[in-house]
């Protein structure tokens, strides 16, 4: 897979500069996630709250769905431990819990986009949170 310049840059920040998390923004919708070495690259986090309701032409990206990125660090080592994603839906300038089918859509879309970076996105059994972890760590 040929790496885009911004992907190489994000990986270098982790490998050479010791950055723990690269937080991508301005995509207006969630994009792929990559665990790279000891670091985490969030290629696009979308908008947590916006005023785009009613703007047409971008429905396939589901910019009405938002994610809270909950990153846990190990207290003794300071290393990244896990990433959990809490889905929300933006409705009338408020965040609400999305319907189950929208959470499943997020799971499938993020899993598909993140697999090329060696990361798996899965829905927790409670149906309210997603996990993202390196494929190599999944048993």
What are the residue ranges of the model-derived segments?
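Conserved beta-sheet core of the metallophosphoesterase superfamily
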Residues: 2-67
């Amino acid at each position: 897979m040929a790496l885009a310049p911004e992907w190489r840059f994000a990986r270098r920040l982790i490998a050479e500069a010791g950055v723990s998390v690269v937080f991508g923004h301005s995509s207006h919708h969630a994009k792929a996630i990559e665990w790279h070495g000891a670091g985490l690259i969030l290629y696009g986090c979308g908008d947590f709250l916006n005023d785009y309701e009613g703007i047409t032409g971008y429905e396939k990206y589901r910019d009405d769905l938002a994610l809270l990125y909950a990153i846990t660090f190990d207290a003794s080592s300071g290393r990244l431990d896990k990433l959990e994603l809490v889905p929300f839906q933006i409705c009338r300038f408020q965040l609400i819990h999305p319907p189950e089918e929208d959470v499943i859509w997020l799971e499938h879309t993020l899993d598909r986009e993140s697999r090329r970076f060696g990361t798996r996105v899965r829905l927790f059994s409670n149906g309210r949170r997603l996990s993202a972890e390196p494929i190599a760590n999944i048993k």
